[in-house]
Amino acid sequence: MAKLTPMMEQYIQIKNEYKDAFLFYRLGDFYELFYEDATRAAQELEITLTKRAGGKGDPIPMCGVPYHSAENYIKTLIDRGYKVAICEQVEDPKTAKGVVKREVVQMITPGTVMESTMLTDGENNYIGSLSHFQDGSYVIVYNDLSTGENRLAFINDGWDAVIHEFYNQPIKEIVISSNLPEELQIQLKERLNVTLSYQDEVTFNAEFRELSENLNDERLMKAFSRLLNYIQTTQKRSLHHLQKAEVIELKKYMSLDMYSKRNLELTETIMKKSKHGSLLWVLDKTVTAMGARTLKKWLERPLLSKQKINERLEVVQGFYDGFMERESLRDLLKSVYDLERLSGRIAFGNVNARDLIQLKQSLSRIPAIQETLRQFDQPEITRLAEMLIYPEQMVESLEKSIVDEPPISIKEGSLIKEGYHDQLDTYRDASRNGKKWIAQLEHQEREETGIRSLKVGYNRVFGYYIEITKPNLHLLPEGRYERRQTLTNAERFVNEELKEKEKLILEAEEKSVELEYDLFIQIRDQIKEEIPLIQQLAHIISQMDVLQSFATVSESNNYVRPDFNDEQLQVTKGRHPVVEQVMKDGTFVPNDVVFDKSQNMLLITGPNMSGKSTYMRQVALTSIMGQIGCFIPAEQATLCVFDQIFTRIGAADDLVSGQSTFMVEMLEARHAISNATDRSLILLDEIGRGTSTYDGMALAQAIVEYIHHNIAAKTLFSTHYHELTALEDSLHHLKNIHVRAEEHEGNVVFLHQIKEGAADQSYGIHVAKLADLPNELIERASVILEELEDDSNKKPTPTKDKLESGQLSFFIEESNKKKAEMPKQEKTHNNQEQSVIEDLKNVNVLDLTPLEAMNELYRLQKGLKQY
């Protein structure tokens, strides 16, 4: 039986070590993929699948991509959640005995991307790890390999808290123990849409001792080691740029669960998953990539410390007041490149000369930035100037060494300036002098042969040559040159003198290129030692950029600086920060909001499309803006510090997610009332809409009462159940407000104004008219509405005693009364009809998704039609 070729044996041996990755196997100028890798890659990358002989059995499936354009193909695979192992030739094929030695030099995974073309400038690219301990606690670790950031957090509130924490970060890959229960692994993959990787080795590596100085708990050390061991195993190179681990004390930040982040559209919109239309879109006036990433991190973790909030607000105030100085600062910051990721590439070894020029240009701006900061009349801003350290020696070294416009490649020369290195100058002189001699040779040979068209040229295959056109060959003295190449219209020759000069020139050029590469590596390694300083500068500049961004957006959008206290929230003429920017005509209607000790729950009524949800989101968004240190859209504002914000606002339910709309409502409501405190903000929009009227009304009232009596969180509760407005008489901290609307000539006009008291009608039919439903349908609905209202007027209203009892007994009594008045149906159904009825009785509506409910209804209806 035929054996595999030695090369394919080598491939299989390497592939067996990287079974969960596409193996990009270097063959000459291509990366080749074989077997199942080739079949899948051909589909994913839309490239041709071929076959090659492997020395055993049937031909082997194969596909390949050119190495010089492989990055785009790798990016496609990484974006789809795959891993790629890069297998390179690690010895010179000219000196190799047998098969050229190859080994994997790097594993690229969704969470360990370093190539700039695969990264988004304004976003972190986190890899995380999750470790579970016997005491029930979890430790989450985040690392952004491109910036060197390391952060850890304890999670002591159970599995849901783990999911919420991961959801709030741009996580691409999570490293876990292979012993984590399978059902939890499935939840991580499905709920977070991440790649899972495994690392069971958590032994602490002494190499990481300096990085873990801030960790004083064995659980933190093990969790950190799990992630670092995985990164070191996959990357196989220097991790010199990794920063000391920072422990995130979650209790110092506002908690925003996954529902709130989604419903409030903090960083992306619900429908389009786009930054445009989110709060981040409005606030982002940063001019550096570092600042954009920092802004997003701040937005996801608002502060709880009033002192720290006010420290940020002080700097924003200073930037706000100094318009001209701020514009000068913005112009300077625009010329600062991404220092965090530049330092990462320097440490990683994939930096090029253009990157070093970007570093030089960025650092050279620091003196001007310092001078501009000193012009502000604000101590906190001038203190920033003193925190910046100008690395003058590094800038001077780069100025002397690297040419201003270097090539991308660092292995083809033309990187180092003249005068930087004596030996390099000698090689260059030899090369230049040789080329000058060749130019003189051409003139000399033309004179001596009399052939005016004779020329001296060069190509990579044949080197230097003397070219004579065929019509002039008869003028060439016999034996003067040695024939080298025959062309259609000419002959090419050499002589001994030319061959000697060629050798000298090429040796000089080769040595020059080699020396330039060595010098570049030396310069890079010198800068590598200064990475902590570069990262410190990046940290200061990124925060400065965010704070000037807050000042810029506050000035352009007419925001006001908020005050903070412990109890009261009072915003005068507040505006929704996003909606007012989308409505560029300036027609947004501002509204007030007041919460204090006597009034911590607002029950909002009013028609659909009137602005209830917008008002609720507005309160939450302005609170978040204040707690990250930004001014807010209002005329005047006093805010309290919220420890958590919970939301249940619709428009994001998934019909086929496996959970009904009502179940989603209940889960989100449960999450809020189970975790909220008296320092929290709760937004509940139309609770109970997903079930029957009586069930929904009963649950809505019970939730209102529970929050009022047991939690005392500041709450905005919108409802279509107008009966609930009577609760104002019995719940002393609840106040009715409504969104004003008026009828004019048979049409409804939404004024979007919040007024005290309950709404007097819902205007639902008017909304249907705006939706352009058929006139016949609208007219019929109006008739039915009049009949229902007449019937309703004959019924008693719920008494205060019944409302205070915590039960909607009135509605239950009415329901029982209707049942009693219904005539008993004669049992005339045949067995088949009765079977359908029994099926209908047994349907558990609350366990069905809307799509499943429609399918079940169709089946039952079809069964009845047969009879």
From Swiss-Prot:
Q: Which UniProt keywords apply?
A: ATP-binding, DNA damage, DNA repair, DNA-binding, Nucleotide-binding
One Gene Ontology term, aspect cellular component: cytosol
Q: Which GO terms describe its molecular function?
A: ATP binding; ATP-dependent DNA damage sensor activity; damaged DNA binding; mismatched DNA binding
Q: Which residues bind ATP?
A: G606, P607, N608, M609, S610, G611, K612, S613
Q: From the UniProt record, give one GO term of the biological process aspect.
A: mismatch repair
PROSITE patterns according to UniProt? DNA_MISMATCH_REPAIR_2 (PS00486)
Which CDD domains does the UniProt record give?
ABC_MutS1
This protein's source sits in the domain of life called: Bacteria
Give the matching NCBIfam families: mutS1, PRK05399.1
Q: Which family does it belong to?
A: Belongs to the DNA mismatch repair MutS family.
Q: Which PANTHER family match?
A: DNA MISMATCH REPAIR PROTEIN MSH1, MITOCHONDRIAL, DNA MISMATCH REPAIR PROTEIN MUTS FAMILY MEMBER
Q: What does this protein do?
A: This protein is involved in the repair of mismatches in DNA. It is possible that it carries out the mismatch recognition step. This protein has a weak ATPase activity.
What name does this protein carry?
A: DNA mismatch repair protein MutS
Q: Which gene encodes it?
A: mutS
